[in-house]
Amino acid sequence: MDITIIIPMKDTEDQIMKCLDSIKINTLSRDRYEVIIIDDASKQPSEFLSEKYDIHYFYSKKSLGAGGARNLGIRMARGKYICFIDSDDWISYDYLEKGLTYMEQCASEIGMFTLKREYDDIKDIIYKCKYNTLLQLGPEESIKVMAKEYNFDVNIVPSTTNKIYLRQFLIDNNIFFPENRKFEDLLFSIKTMLVASKLICIPDATYFHYRRKGSIVQSFEHKNSEDMLFILKEIKVYLENNNYFEIYKKSFYLFCEHFMNLIIRQINEFCSDENIKKAEMTFIVKNLLQQINLDEYLASISAEKLRMHIQPYIIDTNIL
């Protein structure tokens, strides 16, 4: 078995068939991949999917979260490589074959695909990352590009769904997802990138990510703040425990900036009560300050970045 595709689902029966149809028409021979659906305590089981699509379907009565569902899939997988796909997303027809070909050709532990985002109410084509040629990167370049510390005219996103992993590489390094936490992809991506010997950008094969209303970044609840802070703390502890923090200090602070801005945007956009807004933003700032060394952070940023923190809405800085 070459590839195991792991798909967590939760009350997405109406969307998952588009996902499974895109897998079904892939050019890779059907006997070379398996599909495992981990149903994360949906209100109604979807057992008919097993027969209709010739896949493995596992229903969990206990909610595992996306991370826990993927962990179960990793342990069940028989493929040499693993892909994660969200149940409301889909892939291009050559995704599996190109992924397998380039991973074998380059002897890489991680492969990354073009990620195109689709929205409910936006018709423009939006690429979060796009790869037209084969690129090979080491761990340091990959993480610093992902953090936008380095600019190589290429983007790397922390999502795990537009990637393919060597399964034994995950097992040997005991890398699994944090369970029942949002933003789990960032911690998983950093851990895998740090210990990989080679990462590749796979050209001309696309993962289509559907951004629906009500998704993690299109809504807000207090758990978003708690989970973001938990993930950032875990990243810092992991970097420090493995003597990586000095190398990736600036990247860590850039991740903190990015995810704090994301949460603040969610609070501002989706909380209507001004008192709740203030309480949530105060919670974020106070707790994030416990994760950072202010002197280190100030040393890592430019004067212009500092000005933007102090005067975010002022573009014209002329006195007169």
Regions found by a protein language model. Name each.
Residues 3-15, 19, 26, 38:
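A conserved hydrophobic helix/loop-capping motif in glycosyltransferases and polysaccharide synthases
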Residues 46, 60-77:
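Glycine-rich, basic loop-to-helix element that forms the pyrophosphate-binding segment
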Residues 2-4, 22, 34, 187:
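Cell-envelope/extracellular polymer assembly enzymes that use nucleotide-activated donors
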